Design a protein with these regions (language model features):
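Short beta-strand scaffold segments in enzyme catalytic cores
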Residues: 11-17
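Mobile, glycine- and charge-enriched loop segments
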Residues: 41-65, 159-161, 165-176
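Local cysteine-cluster metal-coordination motifs and their immediate loop/turn environment
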Residues: 62-78, 95-100
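Short, flexible loop/turn motifs enriched in small residues
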Residues: 6-10
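Glycine-biased flexible loop/turn sites that connect beta-strands or occur in inter-domain linkers
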Residues: 20-21
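Short beta->alpha transition motifs characteristic of CBS
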Residues: 25-31
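Zinc-dependent deaminase
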Residues: 1-3, 78-176
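A short, polar/charged loop-to-alpha-helix boundary motif
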Residues: 31-45
């Protein structure tokens, strides 16, 4: 809420200990301070600024939304071997009116097959399991086991997104 009230997008992340799922750091987008401080990147920054911290491979990386290309790279370069998210790229675009993740992944990374002008329809935008990390979409399990909680979270993020959308363009954020 504080980040959105400051003019930032609705994304956030937390880094937890794998051993007990306790929170090590949590962060929200802070693009008004620096356009690179996406929730995940800001969490990584805070994690490595700690005087001591567990090895990234001993952590769970939790994202409110599926990471963009910047954050995917940050997670890989930082040594986190996993991340989980609740809202997908499609959710960000369709439910929260923030389409840039899909647009950038398609424009920059989606290399078309030689026999077509664009990438194959429905092709994943990144390798969800690769040499660097494995990603997990939490929504199917959350929706099945905690439908009321998911509905409340979706409503909260829709409200925060509406607040952000009403104010976007008044700050100094690229791709607002």
């Amino acid at each position: 809420r504080t980040g959105v009230a400051s003019g930032n997008k609705i994304f956030g992340a937390a880094i937890l200990r794998k051993s007990d799922l306790s929170v090590i750091v949590a962060a929200a987008n802070d693009e008004t301070a620096n356009p690179l401080w996406h929730g995940e990147i800001h969490a990584i920054k805070k994690f490595f600024e700690l005087p001591s911290h567990p090895a990234p491979a001993d952590c769970v990386f939790l994202c409110t939304h599926e990471p963009c290309s910047l954050c995917l790279s940050g997670i890989a370069w930082s040594g986190f071997d996993n991340f989980s998210y609740l809202f997908s790229h499609a959710d960000s675009a369709m439910s929260f009116a923030i389409p840039y993740d899909i647009a950038i992944l398609n424009a920059v990374y989606a290399v078309p097959d030689p026999d077509r002008s664009g990438p194959a329809p429905g092709r994943d935008l990144y390798n969800r399991s690769n040499d660097y990390f494995t990603s997990t979409n939490l929504m199917p399990v959350a929706r099945a086991q905690l439908p009321d909680t998911v509905d409340r979270l979706h409503a909260l993020y829709a409200e925060l997104s509406a607040q952000y959308q009403a104010r976007k363009g008044t700050g100094n954020i690229a791709m607002a």
